[in-house]
C-alpha cells in the first residue's frame, strides 16, 4: 500500500476515535464543551487527507486508486459527517449511557423516504468527490498520470446508479416490519 492508502486508513481510524472520545467526554464525563471540541475535529481530519493527497500529486506522483479513494472519502465525509455523528450520538446515548430513546427502525414509506434522503446525500457526496477528482485531473493535465482517477469516477458513477435503483425499489417493495415472536402463537 502506498502512503495515501495508509493516510486514508489513519484518517478513518482518527475519525471514529475523535467521535468516540467526543461522545465519551460529553456524556460520561459531562464535559460538553470539550466533547464538542473533539467532535469538531472531524473536518480537520478531512483537511489533513486533502493536504496529503494534494502534496503527493504536486510532487509529481502518478495518481493511484488511493488518490481517487481519498477524494471519495472526503466527499462522503463532508456529505455524511453530521449524519454519522448524529447516528453515533443516538447509539452511544442509548446503549452506553442507557439514556435517550431506542434508535428508530424504519419500515414502509418511512424507510423509503429515509432511503431517498440517503441517496440524495450520496449525490451530494458524489458531486463533492467528483469535483475533487475532476480538479485533480484538470490540474495534473496528463492523462497517463490520471487514469486511476478517471476509473474511480466511472466506477462511482455506476455505483450511484445502482444505489438509485436500490432506493427506488424501497418505494416499489417497501420494507415490512417483521412479526414479533409474541404474535406467532
Curated annotation (Swiss-Prot):
One of its GO terms (cellular component) is plasma membrane. Its main location: membrane. The chain crosses the membrane at residues 4-24, 35-55, 60-80, 123-143, 152-172. It comes from the Bacteria. Keywords: Cell membrane, Membrane, Transmembrane, Transmembrane helix. Coiled coil: none annotated. The keyword Ribosomal protein does not apply. It is found in: Cell membrane. It is a multi-pass membrane protein. This is Uncharacterized membrane protein YmcC. It comes from Bacillus subtilis (strain 168).
